[in-house]
């Protein structure tokens, strides 16, 4: 018996020794990678030894201006582990501003492959937070990324909730259930400003609210009718009555804070008599019947859609004797139909800038391929096309002036207002801000607790933002996934996952050096192939990773002037 | 405070006295007497009459056209609080009994004109449902057989859906708007009238006086139009009165969802919806249309209840 016990004891001891050896060898394995890099807490940059075995990937469009592809990208090449080269078909002055847009966030190639190009609920990024769980219909919960190379979040948990009504969101703040919210109602501004427990965060986002016409439908095919409406709407009254402080009546389509936005003549002044005369001369002395279409969705550019629609309806009747019926459409259907030029009346829509460049406003709306306002106007899109490929600002300036004047001459839409937007936070939150471009990253907000709760207008559609366009999805993604560049608190473009991107002389080739030693939330190391594969998933329609949520990849399509290997349009 | 039972007894005593002294009272006069004895019914009738008068004389009562935007015409802004001069509001400020709405229109005028829309919608909806449902119910009950089976199964299918949900589905197909909302609510209401009418016809066609008419050689058409339907109408009248309230409530619900009346129509449901986001900053703009809906529905319900009691033949005994 005693001998048996001794044997048993010996076996147990041996097992413990073996287990200890095994665990120590595991530790060696996991720490091997960090040992290869040298990281200092004070500096956010790290260095690593590039792997000689690295096989760089390439996204090749097959050449510029080839049959079926007229986009911006020639090739995107992983030159080495930490260098990516973007070879473009034309000079692209807005390159840095564009790649800073959160839609172009980078995810690990292994994760994109594992999810078939559709990490809709489980994105993996390098951001200050990682997705913990998405409670559908309730909230998205994030956990802090303790290994974040930037400012590590003070809160361990971030909860993103939603409530469609601004009053409901404000109630969440007032009752202490949330720390911040998006877009308060105009009527709530005085309450918020008077409440010592709340802080109003002005969000100087460049935006535009406009009423658009599609010139393929009568009577909007008549430029004088469009001009009459442009002169017959008291835009100042709309801004004064329905917009919060910080809003202004639009003198041009693009806000003046964007370079070249206000080149050219200012918009028509309100003159009801002249408008009526012009309408009569156009063949409509007694007015006509039309429809005002809009979606009941609050945005910074349109804080009270119903009120504004009703006022435009009243002004059309009062000033021009135009009988307008108001039709509220479902948001998705409205965007889809208006974008395709399928609305026969006036459509009330707006735009919030994605990146700080005039191309983001003018080129999207008035490009040759955009059918929103019916048949495009060459007088507008031709100077825009030339300007977008012009590196020299002095050369671009007169082109934008020409385009803005042509917009005023042909009136595809009436610019109404640049809305003042805001977020709200409780006074307890330190460092709260609302940037003009991009979105808040909540590692910079500190409420002094373990959890921070933010309420936005709607539930994200998905968390794979390469294939999303709505602000609610982009806000959620911004916490997790980062792009090569980003926007700082003041809206300036700054390096993020790249340390710098250097152009050639004519701005058609951009070479980006990547931040080294960055680790994704899944533990994989960020390198140049992740950039190439992330862009391939968005840009190359033939890639097996080009799946996404809807598969449209709208921003990739429009900001890069079309997808590579895009299927031929029907018809 | 006279109890309901007591009032019935008084009425019956009066009726009996009348019977002894004078010629017998007609059924309708008896009903009217019984109705007058029901205080809640009379309150309901009072509310309904008040609303009808308000709707008819809206242009006289309302100080402004309902859709007139007052920007630039008066020194008022959106969602101004009520200003009543006799209650101390500054004489220099324009008087708005219920304040202004989000589009700077006089809220009181819109509430007054809203009665027109709601009452018209309620009456028309019930009329359509009563005519269509009553017609099919009467034919089905009288003819019976396969026709009865088909009609009533269709009615069962319609009844199988929650009424507001079905109305939403119908409006979704027809498109939003007051007219389509009216049609949708009418369609949803048809089965109730059809079933009640059928049940009444089934009972009455076996009555002795109907059999007597048959023996005297009356045609089916004569029997149905002169004997059966007139005697089957009583419960339908009660149902219709209560149905007006339901129709107004459903119309307000559809408008609240953006499927009924469209801007700038001053429909109470849509007025409520337009201001739902301002519940905390301008609660009165939600309260006034909500109260108007409540008052109208209460009025019709009380009147309907009173009518039901008054028309109940059991109370003759």
Regions found by a protein language model. Give the residues of each.
Chain A
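Ligand/substrate-recognition segments at binding pockets and active sites
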Residues: 280-353, 393, 421, 454
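N-terminal lobe/hinge region of extracytoplasmic solute-binding protein
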Residues: 121-125, 455-505
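Long beta-strand-rich cores associated with HINT superfamily self-processing modules
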Residues: 423-453
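Ligand-site clamp/hinge motif
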Residues: 117, 145-191, 515, 530, ...
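Acidic-aromatic pocket-rim loops
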Residues: 49-55, 333-390, 433-436, 465-470, ...
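Surface-exposed binding/hinge segments that line
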Residues: 49-109, 543-571
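Structural transition elements
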Residues: 248-281, 297-307, 429
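Extracytoplasmic/peripheral linker and loop segments enriched in polar/acidic and small residues
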Residues: 65-70, 74-77, 227, 239, ...
């Amino acid at each position: 018996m005693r001998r048996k016990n001794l044997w048993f004891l010996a076996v147990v001891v041996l097992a413990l020794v073996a287990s200890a050896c095994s665990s120590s060898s595991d530790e060696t394995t996991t720490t091997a990678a960090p040992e290869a890099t040298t990281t200092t807490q004070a500096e956010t940059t790290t260095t690593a030894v590039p792997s000689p075995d690295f096989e760089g990937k390439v996204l090749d469009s097959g050449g510029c201006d080839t049959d079926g592809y007229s986009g911006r990208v020639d090739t995107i090449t992983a030159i080495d582990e930490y260098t990516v080269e973007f070879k473009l078909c034309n000079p692209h002055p807005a390159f840095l501003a564009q790649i800073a847009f959160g839609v172009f966030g980078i995810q690990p190639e292994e994760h994109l492959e594992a999810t078939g190009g559709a990490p809709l609920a489980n994105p993996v990024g390098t951001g200050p937070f990682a997705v913990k769980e998405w409670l559908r219909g309730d909230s998205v919960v994030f956990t802090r990324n303790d290994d974040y190379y930037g400012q590590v979040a003070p809160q361990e948990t971030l909860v993103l909730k939603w409530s469609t009504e601004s009053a409901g969101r404000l109630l969440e703040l007032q009752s202490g259930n949330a720390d911040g919210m998006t877009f308060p109602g105009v009527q709530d501004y005085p309450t918020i400003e008077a409440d010592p427990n709340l802080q109003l965060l002005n969000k100087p986002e460049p935006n535009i609210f406009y009423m658009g016409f599609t010139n393929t439908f009568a009577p909007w095919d008549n430029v004088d009718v469009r001009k009459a409406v442009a002169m017959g709407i008291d835009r100042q009254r709309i801004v004064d009555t329905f917009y919060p402080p910080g809003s202004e009546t639009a003198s041009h389509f693009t806000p003046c804070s964007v370079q070249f936005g206000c080149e050219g003549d200012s918009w028509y002044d309100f003159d009801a008599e002249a408008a009526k005369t012009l309408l009569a001369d156009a063949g409509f002395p007694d007015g006509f019947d039309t429809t005002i279409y809009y979606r009941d969705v609050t945005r910074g550019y349109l804080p009270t859609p119903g009120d504004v629609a009703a006022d435009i309806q009243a002004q059309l009747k009062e000033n021009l004797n135009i009988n307008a019926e108001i039709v509220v459409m479902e948001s998705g259907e409205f965007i889809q139909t208006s974008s395709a030029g399928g609305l026969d009346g006036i459509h009330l829509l707006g735009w919030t800038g994605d990146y700080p460049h005039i191309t983001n406003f003018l080129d999207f709306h008035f490009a040759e391929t955009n059918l929103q306002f019916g048949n495009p106007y060459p007088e507008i899109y031709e100077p825009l096309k030339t300007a977008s490929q012009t590196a020299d600002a002095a050369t671009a300036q007169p082109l934008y002036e020409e385009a803005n004047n042509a917009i005023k001459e042909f009136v595809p839409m009436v610019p109404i207002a640049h809305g003042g937007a805001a977020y709200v936070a409780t006074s307890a939150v330190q460092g709260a801000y609302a940037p003009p471009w991009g979105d808040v990253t909540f590692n910079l907000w500190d409420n002094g607790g373990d959890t921070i709760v933010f309420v936005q207008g709607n539930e994200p559609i998905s968390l794979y933002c390469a294939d999303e366009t709505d602000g609610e999805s982009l806000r959620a993604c911004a916490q997790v996934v980062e792009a090569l560049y980003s926007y700082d608190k003041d809206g300036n473009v700054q390096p993020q996952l790249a340390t710098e991107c250097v152009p050639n002389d004519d701005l058609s080739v951009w070479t980006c050096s990547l931040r080294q030693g960055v680790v994704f939330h899944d533990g994989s190391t960020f390198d140049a192939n992740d950039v190439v594969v992330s862009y391939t998933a968005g840009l190359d329609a033939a890639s097996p990773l080009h799946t996404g949520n809807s598969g449209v990849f709208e921003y990739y399509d429009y900001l890069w002037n079309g997808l590579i290997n895009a299927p031929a349009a029907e018809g | 405070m006279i109890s309901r039972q007591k009032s019935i007894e008084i009425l019956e005593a009066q009726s009996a006295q009348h019977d002894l002294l004078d010629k017998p009272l007609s059924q309708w006069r008896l009903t009217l007497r019984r109705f007058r004895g029901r205080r809640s019914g009379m309150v309901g009738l009072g509310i309904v009459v008040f609303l009808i008068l308000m709707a008819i004389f809206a242009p006289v009562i309302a100080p402004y056209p309902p859709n007139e935007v007052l920007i630039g015409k008066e020194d008022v802004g959106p969602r101004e609080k009520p200003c009543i001069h006799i209650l101390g509001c500054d004489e220099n400020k324009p008087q708005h009994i219920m304040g202004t709405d989000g589009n700077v229109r006089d809220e009181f005028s819109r509430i007054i004109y809203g009665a027109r829309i709601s009452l018209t919608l309620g009456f028309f909806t019930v009329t359509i449902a009563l005519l269509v449902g009553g017609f099919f119910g009467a034919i089905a009950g009288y003819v019976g057989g396969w026709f009865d089976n088909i009609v009533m199964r269709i009615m069962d299918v319609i009844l199988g859906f929650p009424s507001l949900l079905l109305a939403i589905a119908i409006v979704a197909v027809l498109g939003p708007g007051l007219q389509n909302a009216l049609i949708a609510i009418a369609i949803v209401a048809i089965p109730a009238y059809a079933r009640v009418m059928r049940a009444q016809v089934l009972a009455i066609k076996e009555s002795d006086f109907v059999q007597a008419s048959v023996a005297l050689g009356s045609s089916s058409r004569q029997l149905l139009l002169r004997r059966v339907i007139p005697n089957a109408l009583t419960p339908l009248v009660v149902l219709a009165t209560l149905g007006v309230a339901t129709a107004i409530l459903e119309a307000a619900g559809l408008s609240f969802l953006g499927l009924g009346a469209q801007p700038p129509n001053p429909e109470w449901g849509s007025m409520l919806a337009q201001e739902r986001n301002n519940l905390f900053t301008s609660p009165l703009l939600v309260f006034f249309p909500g109260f108007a809906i409540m008052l109208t529905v209460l009025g019709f319900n009380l009147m309907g209840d009173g009518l039901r009691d008054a028309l109940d033949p059991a109370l003759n005994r």
